[in-house]
Amino acid sequence: MPQSTQDNTQETRFKPRQIIDGLRRIKMVVEYDGAAFHGWQIQTNPPVPTIEAAILEAFEQITATKPKDLVAAGRTDRGVHATHMTCHLDTFAPIALNKIQTGLNRFLPDTIAVREVEEVDQNFHARYSCVGRKYTYKILNRRNRSPLYHARAEHVPHQLDLAE
């Protein structure tokens, strides 16, 4: 009886495409407050504000071109924040890396910032090269709610039973 084996290494999960001359893969680390956004991924029916759409629009502002791809290590849901979302885009635009970061941060809303930018090999893939994810869930455990934490923590006004 034939046996199948599944190998979850990067090489089997991501098949690099043919290297394209002149194409630049730009890796970015993005931080954002997702309260005003409907998640990472573009949504067109109906169109709503997303992190991906904001980055693409800002990139078009600074290069007058659309990137070939914008890929994130993961996707966040509506209202979710990120401190270190790694993503990459592919472009032929001959713009300096420091101008990409400065330009994106100039045109992005104040709730999104590009923290790091670097040019990487075309075989890097934000999703498949990712080796881990870290999530933080915050609970405000006190009687009264806090206006400072209303969108950043789950308010639990009663005593928590941590024994269960």
Residue ranges and their predicted role:
Residues 7-8:
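Intrinsic-disorder-associated, low-complexity terminal segments enriched in Asp/Asn/His/Tyr and depleted
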